[in-house]
């Protein structure tokens, strides 16, 4: 029988309002734990667009302010890094203020609600903060991607991550890659576990009505073949390689179209690249899509593609949300063999995996599926079945629940020996 935990989560990203695309995986983790009977309190930075009530679906929200000037509201919500590779100048000024404010907020909320456990999302900065604020409370830290990258490349961040790793009771990662990299930095392998993200299989589903809605939104005719991808326009998404692949495919597939949902620092560059490759009329950019719109676009697509890469600085996605959403939608998926992607895709059964930074490999895989509707149906059906069997958000919440119990048990043993 699991314990009932009073959890204070510290995070730098969370959907700021219903339908927001920032930190989308955080909401189902928090809501899933609350639905299983735990008291969940989320401490998060204030943001001008933050529109959360005090309690929603059993999750309590505690925003903290840190910026004396609006220009310094760059802590969290994917605002600290430029193209996910370099810290913005304002982030250097905001970070000390935000770290101090988040530490005070965690201590205040934990005392007020009688916390039994602290959970930091991203080891830098939240993991380091909860480790410093915990006292005797058990600490769980979750790795999501850019945190490990920052720790690997910046000495002060590395020292903070290593200090947090020594203090925490249990570590989770959304991919084996992140877990192994943090172990290489000093985390205890015996207290580190991989918990891949889940997906809302009710929202993301194969459905004729949803497919028709998506095709209308795309403006696709009945005979057109649609590829879909989505994400922030940053280097590690690898969208430029997909555009190059479309440039190669377009002459042979006149009915082929590509839709790239999202936005970000590379918007103008990606649009320009479509012109350079002669496919500006084949590639559309609908902007940042709400979750329901992503579901419709995936249902309306013939193939989903996630061309993630290690960027030039070495940063890589932990596990892109679009991968899980495509699998649940039964949309056949071509993805690169990087980060956490291989941990959720079995090649030639639930999707196709190719090497990164390889437009020719993307071209070959996409063309093979375009030419074989039977293979597309087979991959999509197997992917959907795999999601329903073990990759729902409830399964993820149960896995975190088990980690909480282990962390609490270890903290009790530690207190007995202190």
Task: Please place each PLM-identified region on the residue numbering.
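Acidic donor-binding loop of glycosyltransferase active sites
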Residues: 282, 299-316, 331
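Conserved donor-binding/catalytic core segment of Leloir-type glycosyltransferases
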Residues: 221-237, 243-246
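Short hydrophobic beta-strand element within catalytic cores of glycosyltransferases
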Residues: 323, 328, 332-335, 345
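Nucleotide-activated donor-binding/catalytic signature segment of Leloir-type glycosyltransferases, i.e.
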Residues: 271-293
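Conserved acidic donor-binding segment of nucleotide-sugar-dependent glycosyltransferases
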Residues: 344-348, 352-359, 368-374, 389
């Amino acid at each position: 029988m699991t314990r009932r935990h009073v959890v204070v989560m510290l995070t730098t990203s969370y959907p700021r309002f219903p339908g927001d695309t920032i930190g989308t995986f955080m909401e189902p983790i928090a809501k899933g734990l609350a639905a299983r009977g735990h008291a969940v309190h989320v401490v998060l930075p204030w943001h001008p667009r933050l529109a959360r009530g005090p309690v929603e679906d059993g999750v309590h929200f505690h925003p903290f302010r840190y910026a004396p000037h609006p220009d310094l509201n760059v802590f969290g919500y994917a605002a600290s890094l430029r193209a996910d590779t370099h810290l913005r100048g304002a982030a250097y000024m905001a970070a000390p203020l935000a770290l101090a404010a988040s530490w005070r907020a965690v201590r205040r909320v934990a005392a007020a609600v009688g916390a039994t456990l602290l959970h930091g999302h991203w080891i830098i900065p939240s993991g380091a903060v909860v480790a410093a604020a915990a006292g005797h409370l058990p600490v769980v830290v979750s790795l999501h991607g850019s945190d490990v990258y920052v720790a690997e490349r910046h000495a002060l961040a590395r020292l903070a991550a290593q200090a947090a790793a020594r203090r925490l009771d249990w570590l989770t990662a959304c991919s084996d890659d992140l877990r192994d990299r943090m172990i290489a930095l000093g985390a205890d392998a015996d207290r580190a576990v991989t918990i891949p993200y889940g997906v809302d299989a009710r929202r993301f589903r194969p459905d004729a009505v949803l497919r028709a809605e998506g095709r209308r939104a795309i403006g696709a005719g009945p005979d057109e073949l649609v590829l879909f991808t989505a994400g922030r326009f940053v280097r590690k998404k690898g969208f430029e390689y997909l555009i190059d692949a479309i440039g190669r495919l377009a002459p042979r597939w006149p009915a082929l179209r590509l839709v790239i949902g999202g936005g970000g620092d590379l918007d103008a560059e990606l649009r320009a690249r479509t012109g350079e490759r002669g496919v500006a009329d084949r590639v559309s950019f609908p902007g940042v899509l709400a979750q329901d719109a992503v579901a419709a676009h995936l249902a309306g697509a013939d193939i989903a593609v996630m061309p993630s890469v290690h960027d030039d600085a070495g940063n890589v996605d932990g596990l892109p949300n679009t991968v899980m959403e495509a699998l649940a939608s039964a949309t056949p998926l071509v993805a690169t063999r990087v980060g956490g992607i291989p941990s959720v895709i079995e090649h030639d059964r639930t999707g196709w995996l190719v090497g990164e930074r390889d437009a020719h490999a993307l071209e070959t895989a996409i063309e093979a599926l375009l030419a074989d509707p039977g293979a597309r149906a087979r991959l999509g059906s197997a992917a959907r079945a795999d999601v329903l069997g073990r990759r729902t958000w409830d399964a993820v919440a149960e896995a975190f629940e088990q980690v909480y119990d282990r962390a609490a048990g270890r903290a009790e043993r530690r207190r007995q020996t202190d």
